[in-house]
C-alpha cells in the first residue's frame, strides 16, 4: 500500500508588500472585496470602496504600517515566515508552506508549492485560534476555488480552530506569567480579540462563543479570579454595531474609574501585526494613560516561540 505524503499549509490574513499608499491600496482592495469580510450589496459597496474608502484610508494606513515596519517586511510577514521555517525544522520530513488570503504569498502559490513536493494530503492550519466566517471561512472559500481548478486534488484536512487546545492555552498562560513576573501582576488582565459585526454573530457565526471559551480556559489555567480578567473586541470598521465591549472604550472607562495597572493580550492573533503593535501597544496605551491609568503593558503574540511551534506540530499531527 502506497504511503501518503502529507504537507502542511499555514494560512493567515495577509499584508501589504510595502508601507506605501499604493501597496496598501492594492491590499485593502483585495481584502475589502471579499464577501466574507464585507457582505454589503455590491451596488452600494463598490462605489463606496473605490471612490471613498481606498483613496482616504490608504495613505493613512500606510503611515501606520511604516511605524511598525521591520527590516524583513511587515511584522505579520516576518513572524509568519519565522513560524513556517521553525515548523519545517520541527517536522523535517514534512513540507510546510505559507499562504495568505490576501496579498502575497497567496494561498494558491502555497498549494502549488506543496503539490510540487508531490504531497497527496494537505493539512490546512488557519492561524486563527477562534473560528470566524470572516477569517477561517475565507480560507475555506479560497481553498475550494483553488482546488476547483485542479484536475487532481489532494486529500484535505482542515483545522477549523483551536480555541481550547491544551497546548495553545498553556502557551498563552506561560506568556502571561512571564509578563507578570517582569512587570508585576496588574489590577486587570484584558484580553482583546478582533471584532466582527454583531450581525454576523446573530446570523450564526460562533466566533464570540469561541472567544469566551479561550478566555475561560486561560483564566482557569492562570487561576485568576473572573473579575480580574476581561474580554473586549477591537478594530471595528464601519457604522454598524460590532461585538462589544469595545477595547478602546473599555480602556478609557477603566482609566477614568481609577484602575491603575493593566496588561493586554490579544489571544486571537497568532502573530504580531499592525492591529497588535500599533493599535493595541500604542494607540490604546495612550487611551488608557490619557484617561488616568498609570501603567500599561502589551503582552506580545506567541509568534515563533518554541511553545507555539510545538503546539502547531502537535495540532497538525492529529490530522496527518
Curated annotation (Swiss-Prot):
**SUPFAM superfamilies registered for this protein in UniProt:** Chelatase
Task: Provide the primary localization.
Answer: cytoplasm
Keyword Metal-binding found:
yes
Catalysed reactions, as listed in the record: heme b + 2 H(+) = protoporphyrin IX + Fe(2+)
GO cellular component annotations of the record: cytoplasm
Localisation per UniProt entry: Cytoplasm
For biological process, the GO terms are:
heme biosynthetic process
What EC numbers are recorded for this enzyme?
Answer: 4.98.1.1
The entry's Fe cation-binding residues are: 194, 275
Output the Gene Ontology terms for molecular function. ferrochelatase activity; metal ion binding
This protein's pathway: Porphyrin-containing compound metabolism; protoheme biosynthesis; protoheme from protoporphyrin-IX: step 1/1
Enumerate the UniProt keywords alphabetically. Answer: Cytoplasm, Heme biosynthesis, Iron, Lyase, Metal-binding, Porphyrin biosynthesis
Family, similarity comment:
Belongs to the ferrochelatase family.
Summarize the protein's role: Catalyzes the ferrous insertion into protoporphyrin IX.
Indicate the quaternary assembly: Monomer.
HAMAP family (UniProt xref): Ferrochelatase
Q: What is this protein called?
A: Ferrochelatase
- List the gene name: hemH
